[in-house]
């Protein structure tokens, strides 16, 4: 069969890989061939439902995209996930957009406990950004579910863009598409104003949302961050790494040589130190299980996919082995499993954090 291309974005049409560029279901392809209008699923949803979905990029495409952003005189809006800051930082962004103003947007602010003040989170995000070599002109917290937060975000964008175009960038799974959909609703409510154009040298489209003064907001495709937990889970279990509701941190009083299993997705060992409380911040539905450190590995091997889930009994065959990261902690510190959540250590302790091979474990100043 001759190769078909999406008439929206130009990507080659394929029916195998749902996550890949140019995907369309077989039934939709057959309908498209009848009407002579073949769209990939992403463009179809954009055209008919005003709905933007994530698309996965190769590193090469990503570099081309960043070059274009860096070469333009524009405001760069960098969306990060407050729940997973380390997993949502774009490596090398400051290098590429050095001449542009960057507005840092902490998304999913409604996931953090209400007791945490916005000002504290904003300050914390600015500190983390500086550690990553970024110098944002401003930090704003938002949530696609909150209309007034979207209004605040639009006001900040207007304040800092100074008549320029705006590029929205972010990795996959930070909720960028949902946020852009909320922005479109806020600006217009009219789906016919959105157009797409091609990134130079790629088959990737950027979504164009016109502003009143003839400038545009450009939404760019989401960049894959390879060390996020999301890449190791099936669609059904993604909810554990992208909570939709306010997380309720739980504190566990642990003695040395006790272990806490995070479903079957990770593990926390308290190796040495005074008995103390450790505060776990994960999706509320993720079941945590306390046991003795001695024999914990055998316990995991026996119960993963059953008592310790996700992964379920089918998924566990494909799920990567857990790898230990030993750490000595001196004061209040978050131990983060990229894309899953974190455990706050409140005092001196020798600990080990186990995460699937390939998933990053990082320490940071406590956020809560």
Where are these regions (language model features)?
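Conserved ATPase-coupling elements of RecA-like P-loop NTPase cores
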Residues: 87-90, 114-119, 227-230
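Short acidic, S/G/P-rich loop/turn micro-motifs used as interaction or catalytic elements
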Residues: 82-86, 110-113
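Canonical P-loop GTPase G-domain recognition
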Residues: 103, 111-174, 185-192, 196-197
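Amphipathic helical hotspot of TIR/SEFIR-family domains
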Residues: 56, 60-63, 85-96
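Helix-rich effector regions associated with P-loop NTPase G domains
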Residues: 1-75, 100-103, 109, 198-368
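A short alpha->loop->secondary-structure connector
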Residues: 94-101, 189
């Amino acid at each position: 069969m001759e190769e078909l291309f999406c008439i929206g974005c130009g990507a080659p049409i394929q029916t195998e890989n749902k996550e890949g560029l140019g995907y369309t279901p077989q039934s939709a392809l057959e309908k498209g061939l009848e009407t002579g209008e073949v769209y990939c699923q992403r463009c179809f949803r954009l055209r008919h439902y005003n709905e933007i979905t994530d698309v996965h990029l190769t590193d090469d495409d990503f570099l081309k995209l960043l070059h274009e952003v860096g070469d333009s005189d524009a405001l760069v809006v960098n969306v990060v996930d407050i729940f997973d800051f380390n997993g949502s930082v774009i490596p090398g962004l400051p290098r590429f957009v050095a001449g542009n103003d960057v507005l840092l947007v902490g998304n999913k602010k409604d996931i953090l406990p209400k007791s945490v003040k916005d000002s504290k989170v904003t300050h914390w995000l600015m500190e983390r950004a500086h550690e990553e070599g970024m110098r944002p002109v401003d930090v704003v917290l938002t949530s696609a579910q909150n209309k007034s937060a979207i209004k605040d975000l639009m006001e900040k964008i207007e304040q800092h863009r100074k008549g320029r175009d705006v590029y929205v960038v972010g990795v996959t799974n930070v909720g960028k598409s949902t946020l852009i959909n909320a922005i479109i609703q806020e600006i217009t409510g009219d789906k016919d104003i959105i157009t797409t154009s091609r990134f130079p040298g790629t088959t990737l489209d950027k979504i164009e949302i016109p502003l009143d003064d003839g400038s545009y907001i450009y939404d760019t495709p989401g960049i894959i961050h390879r060390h996020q937990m999301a890449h190791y889970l099936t669609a059904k279990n993604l909810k554990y790494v992208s909570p939709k509701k306010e997380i309720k941190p739980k504190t566990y009083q642990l003695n040395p040589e006790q272990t806490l299993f995070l479903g079957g997705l990770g593990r926390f060992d308290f190796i040495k130190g005074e008995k103390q409380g450790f505060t776990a911040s994960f999706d509320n539905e993720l079941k945590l299980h306390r046991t003795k450190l001695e024999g914990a590995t055998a316990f995991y091997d026996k119960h993963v996919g059953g008592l310790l889930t996700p992964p379920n009994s089918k998924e566990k065959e494909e799920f990567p082995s857990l790898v230990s990261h030993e750490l000595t902690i001196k004061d209040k510190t978050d131990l983060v499993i990229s894309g899953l959540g974190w455990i706050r250590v409140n005092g001196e302790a020798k600990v080990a954090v186990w995460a699937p091979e390939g998933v990053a474990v990082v320490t940071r100043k406590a956020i809560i």
